[in-house]
Amino acid sequence: MINEEPNYWPRYTIKDHHRLRHQFSQSERVRRNWSQSMQDMFVLSMLDGKRNGVYVEIGADKPKIINNSYLLERKFGWRGVSFELDESKVEFFNQHRKNKCICTDATTFDYKSLFQERNYPKQIDYLSLDIDPSEATLAALKKLPLDEYRFSVITYETEVYRAGIDGYYDEIWQKQSAEIFESHGYELVIKNVANMGNPYEDWWVDPKVVDRAIIGKFSKTDSWSRESTECIFNNTQFSIMPITAILEE
């Protein structure tokens, strides 16, 4: 049984507010981020600090630390659902979160039925896809009812970095995911988002929903990979707050 979360230094703290590429509505209320690579800050940036949004998080892992939906729920009143295969992780998650996590195999789950049961809007605000291994993430993507539901912002794990570590990664998985997103009218804002030098995610948006002026602040095509701090900040330096400040919610 999991009963604690590890300490984790956030990628964003309030001291970095002045360096945000886009100071979204109520960004001054965010003292720290919780996602591993500032996916939460990217979502809030693209949707200009939207309140009361809806998310779908496939691959939840922990309830707070390195979680993509916690900040959205905690500070901006979002509702949504998370998915995780590990039963002990789900039990721990549900002890600490208002919006619950479902224990299931994300590659076979009937998402459409759940969306209908919960009366989710046809335009869902955020989709986080992050499960292991990469082909499982792709399989989960293919199970989503993409012809009937759209997502305003998508963060999609590709694990490109694995190609240089164990040779396990197959670039076809990233290519196939891109083909799926592009065929449904999504726009790639940042490719190969990196964490500590390891490229592992692509970030997409629905250009019919996200303001073109905001997209323009983040789009960059002259580099193969970008560190997450570079994606969100106007420069790559960021502050470290005292541990007492970091633990504040």
Where do the model's predicted regions map?
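Membrane-proximal basic amphipathic "stem/tether" segments
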Residues: 1-31, 228, 232-249
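Acidic/glycine-enriched edge-of-secondary-structure segments
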Residues: 21-33, 100, 123-132
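SAM cofactor-binding core of SAM-dependent methyltransferases
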Residues: 30-112
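Conserved acidic-Pro-Pro-aromatic motif
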Residues: 70-71, 76-79, 122-129, 133-248
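Conserved amphipathic alpha-helix within the SDR
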Residues: 113-120
